[in-house]
């Protein structure tokens, strides 16, 4: 009688970076994903590194997440965003016009440093639970993503499932770009709405 040994699963190492203007909720997004917590007070981020073991697409990942310090003007690219970064979340807040306007400059800086316009990037409109304070419309975010040939999402860092979906979307784009997954993924828009503009259901992933 013969037996077949089960092949051990190995983890894929991937490094991603979260970038954006100050006070847009980058750290809240990272902490929600890596620690399943939402910070109850704001603390200025110098720069943090987080690690999470995550399973998606029948694969195990050791995901290193760099929470970069927000810059008023992205004249200096963060040193932590070395060439081994596989993908980016580019975050703005829907209640902060300046944070949205600077996204184009950050995107151009990323492409300039990496020299690869196809590097996976997700445009993330955060704080979609603050609907009554919105100054950046969803269509503007979608148009920016179209110009950058990137995916677009609106989320609130208060909702674990939404944040997890964003990181899985980025991982999927990374694996497709490396030929490890068939792509593109099925194009769809997940959108839920309610009559309350501050309801976190008023968010979109497309």
From Swiss-Prot:
The gene is rheb-1. SMART domains: RAB, RAS, RHO. Its EC number is 3.6.5.-. Residues 204-206 form a propeptide. Residues 180-206 are annotated as: Disordered. A lipid is attached at residue 203 (S-farnesyl cysteine). Its main location: membrane. This is GTP-binding protein Rheb homolog 1.
